[in-house]
């Protein structure tokens, strides 16, 4: 009798514990995506502002031929001086957060993300390596709400 009650309770508790664990990783994924995307946006805004300020100071029509996005995720951590427009390298992240749904936990965090370049097509799964315009999860898993993590 006691054994059957324990097995029923275990059968109820285990699935809800797994659901809570998955929900926590989903929350972490959303937070990490937001952190990286905000850093990319801040980089772009800083680049545009420094170019505009440099034009005003020097009276030059300096042309920014690039997209204004970072070349790699590492640039967000290591810092960038924007071609000398900034007195010292500006950093946008302390570290690159990991994708909590990466399949291999030994993979470095910066390699756990899929990346899109500004010139890539929206549905492209191959990074053009021109710059980093966006990041996404490489996971093929399905979220609790039925969407794919890679589409977040």
Regions found by a protein language model. Give the residues of each.
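Low-complexity, acidic interaction segments enriched in glycine
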Residues: 42-152
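Long, contiguous hydrophobic alpha-helical segments, chiefly transmembrane helices and signal peptides
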Residues: 1, 17, 21, 29, ...
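N-terminal single-pass transmembrane signal-anchor helix
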Residues: 1-17
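Short helix/strand-bridging catalytic loops that position acidic/His residues to coordinate divalent metals
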Residues: 17-24, 57-61
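Membrane-proximal N-terminal amphipathic helix
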Residues: 21-49
